[in-house]
């Protein structure tokens, strides 16, 4: 089993330190508004700002490691990951360190679950979430009584999400993938993103797929 945790650990430690320090700064500058009521306009700003800041800090591993030295390209690659778009600016994916490939797949895994959490937690506050549609369409008891608390829902979704990822990893290993490739493809597949660790994507493993025709016995 390949130990990809040993690559670029100082780069990722620096990225994490920058992100945590920036988070503390933002929290310190906004502590006076801790108990302020969030209005619809503030909600839009939080959603847009959250995506932008998440992508900006998510670009740091590419930039600091030198895997993608250009800010524009690193930002695009990270945004593509978090939004599970699947587009990439990389020509030779296999030349990247495996720790960077793992982070690249993880952006899609986080983004895939982030979309769900955004839908059930943020968008309803803006008046455009699923709860409004549920309230308008569902007869009988109110939606609040039928819908569990957001935190409980998020925990259950995360449990299902992680479980499916583990199960797919096991199946991909049984199909012939290495543990590293299986983990990465499970994270990207479960998020419907499409990032791969190979230049040919799943085509790299076509040699493992054997299609056999049933033998016909002559009468």
Predicted segments with their positions:
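N-terminal alpha-helical transmembrane segments of multi-pass membrane transport
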Residues: 1-73
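Transmembrane-helix bundle segments that line or gate the permeation/cavity pathway
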Residues: 51-136, 156-185, 193, 216
């Amino acid at each position: 089993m390949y130990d990809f945790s040993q690559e670029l650990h100082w780069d990722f430690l620096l990225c994490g330190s920058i992100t945590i320090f920036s988070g503390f700064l933002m929290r310190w500058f906004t502590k006076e508004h801790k108990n302020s009521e969030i209005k619809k306009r503030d909600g839009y700003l939080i959603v847009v700002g959250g995506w932008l800041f998440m992508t900006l800090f998510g670009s740091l591993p590419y930039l600091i490691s030198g895997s993608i030295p250009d800010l524009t390209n690193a930002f695009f690659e990270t945004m593509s990951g978090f939004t599970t778009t699947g587009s990439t600016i990389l020509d030779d994916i296999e030349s990247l360190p495996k720790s960077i490939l793992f982070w690249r797949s993880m952006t899609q895994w986080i983004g895939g679950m982030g979309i769900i959490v955004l839908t059930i937690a943020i968008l309803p506050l803006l008046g455009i979430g699923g709860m409004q549609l549920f309230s308008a369409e569902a007869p009988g008891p109110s939606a609040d009584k039928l819908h569990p608390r957001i935190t409980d829902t998020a925990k259950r979704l995360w449990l299902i999400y992680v479980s499916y990822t583990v199960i797919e990893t096991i199946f991909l290993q049984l199909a012939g993938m290495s543990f590293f490739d299986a983990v990465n493809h499970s994270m990207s597949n479960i998020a419907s993103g499409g990032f791969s660790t190979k230049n040919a994507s799943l085509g790299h493993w076509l040699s493992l797929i054997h299609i056999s025709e049933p033998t016909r016995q002559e009468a």
